[in-house]
Amino acid sequence: MKKTEMLKKNYEYKRVLTKGKYYSGKYIEAFIKTNNNNKNFLGIAIGVKIAKAVKRNHIKRLIRENYKNLEEKVNSGNTVVFLWKKKIDIKNANYKNIKQDMEDIFHKSKLFIEEKR
C-alpha cells in the first residue's frame, strides 16, 4: 500500500495552487503538480462559505476515503489539492458521485497507472 502524506502548511497549498495544473469535475476541482519525491501528497480545501463545519468535514471524509481507495492506481510523485466547487449542493455529495468525479480527473491528468494487458 502506498503512503500518501497530507499537506499541512499554507505555503505548500499555495505552491500547488499557483504552479499546478487545473482539472475540473462536476463536484470537485483539482490542482496537480509533480514533485521530486517518490510519494504522493494530498491536500483538501473546503471553503468557509459552506456554513456548517459538520458538512465541510463530511465532504473532507468523502474525498479522503475515495482517494484512499484509488491510491493504488495513481502514479507516485504527485501533489494533489482537491477543492469543493462552491455552487454545488452538498445534498448531492455522496461516495459514488465523488468517486466518479475523482476518476475522471485522474484520467484527464493521466495519473492512473496503465495496466498491462
Predicted segments with their positions:
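Positively charged, solvent-exposed patches that mediate nucleic-acid binding
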Residues: M1-R117
